[in-house]
Regions:
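Short intrinsically disordered, low-complexity coil segments enriched in acidic
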Residues: 1-11, 299-300, 326
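All-beta strand scaffolds that present successive hydrophobic residues in beta-strands
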Residues: 8-11, 37-40, 55-74, 90-98, ...
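Extracellular beta-strand-rich solenoid/capping regions of secreted or surface-exposed proteins
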Residues: 2-8, 16-60, 72-73, 82, ...
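Generic detector of ordered, mature protein regions
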Residues: 20-22, 43, 51, 169, ...
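Glycine-centered low-complexity coil/loop motifs and glycine-rich tracts
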Residues: 44-46, 80-89, 104-116, 131-141, ...
Length: 326
């Protein structure tokens, strides 16, 4: 049983080992009862449900326990939920990561329980081998906020996995953050009210999407990019689903209400900018503003690969080119 008062579990060096096991000596899920900080310690932990309590991985945390993914054994805490792993709701959640290794992190809950207020994740170090979700695996959140200034992750979402965000999901990326896959302001398959993505630094391999993967943004998606080591593509909208000839296209996948994209300071000439989505529609207006920099292509519309993937825009398309070149 974990402490019922705020606690720091630390060692004089990271060689000190903390293992959370059940009566049969198997690694088991840690249920938090109060705010908890790990520092200068080696961990053997399977999963953590923070239950709405502040969870911090301070400097000097190393995780040696392993989980299986894709047939491989990977060192890290497999799952962390800022909310609950049940149908119980919490007022808010707060996860801070400065070191350590992890599989999947959700600011929200692992089951149907909601985070009524804001679910927040702050990452300045450490490694996430899977994905970061500001929201829940299933449960809804009022708002979400993900701030990443360092460390490494594969995918990162401002919103949830299946879980909805009824208000606004915010994603801020800066400094030395490294993302090896795509960036989404919204959810994977859940919905969001609005999304905001602000990128001022970091290193990126693929795309920045203001919207969701296949989930919907019912209001607006706003993307502001002012820096970063990046050679991919910026989309104001969502990803959607690629269709081939004869496929039935679901126009709701990745759909966004309206978009704004503001870009400046990217100078390598390799980045393309779209006001809309990749394979996803925008029902209202799109607006792209270029302030400075050098770019590959700039479109106020969505990406149009073929007649089977039109990425429709339902409203007006506006491109404002204040300065820069293509």
């Amino acid at each position: 049983i974990m402490p019922s008062k705020a606690c720091t579990i630390s060692g004089s060096t990271s060689l000190i080992n903390f293992a959370y096991i059940n009566e049969d000596s198997y690694l088991t899920r840690l249920q938090m009862l109060a705010p908890l900080t790990f520092k200068n310690i080696t961990l053997q932990v399977w999963q953590i449900a923070a239950n709405g309590h502040a969870l911090t991985f301070d400097e000097g945390v190393t995780v040696v326990s392993k989980y299986t993914s894709g047939g491989n054994d990977i060192a890290g805490i497999r799952n962390i939920w800022g909310g609950t792993d049940s149908s119980s709701d919490v007022a808010s959640s707060d996860i801070t990561i400065k070191s350590g290794q992890f599989g999947w992190i959700c600011g929200g809950s692992g089951s149907t329980g909601a985070v009524i207020g804001t679910a927040k994740i702050t990452m300045s170090g450490g490694t996430v081998n899977g994905s970061i979700f500001g929201g829940g695996y299933e449960g809804a959140c009022g708002n979400t906020e993900v701030v990443m200034s360092g460390g490494t992750t594969c995918w990162i979402y401002g919103g949830g996995e299946k879980g909805n965000v009824t208000g606004t999901s915010k994603l801020t990326i800066s400094n030395t953050a490294a993302i090896t896959e795509n960036i989404f302001g919204g959810s994977d398959s859940g919905t969001c009210g609005n999304t905001e993505v602000n990128v001022s630094g970091g290193t990126f391999a693929y795309g920045i999407y203001g919207g969701c993967f296949t989930g919907q943004v019912t209001g607006f998606s706003k993307v502001i990019v002012t820096g970063g080591n990046f050679s991919g593509t910026i989309y104001g909208g969502g990803f959607g689903k690629k269709c081939g000839q004869g496929d039935s296209r679901d126009a709701n996948l990745g759909k966004v209400g309206k978009t704004e994209v503001h870009v400046s300071g990217l100078t390598n000439g390799e980045v393309s900018v779209f006001g809309g989505g990749l394979y996803a529609d925008v029902t209202g207006n799109t607006q792209v503003t270029i302030n400075t920099g050098k770019y590959n292509h700039i479109y106020g519309s969505g990406y149009v690969e073929s007649p089977y993937n039109p990425a429709h825009i339902g409203g007006d398309v506006t491109v404002t080119f204040n300065d820069g070149e293509t």
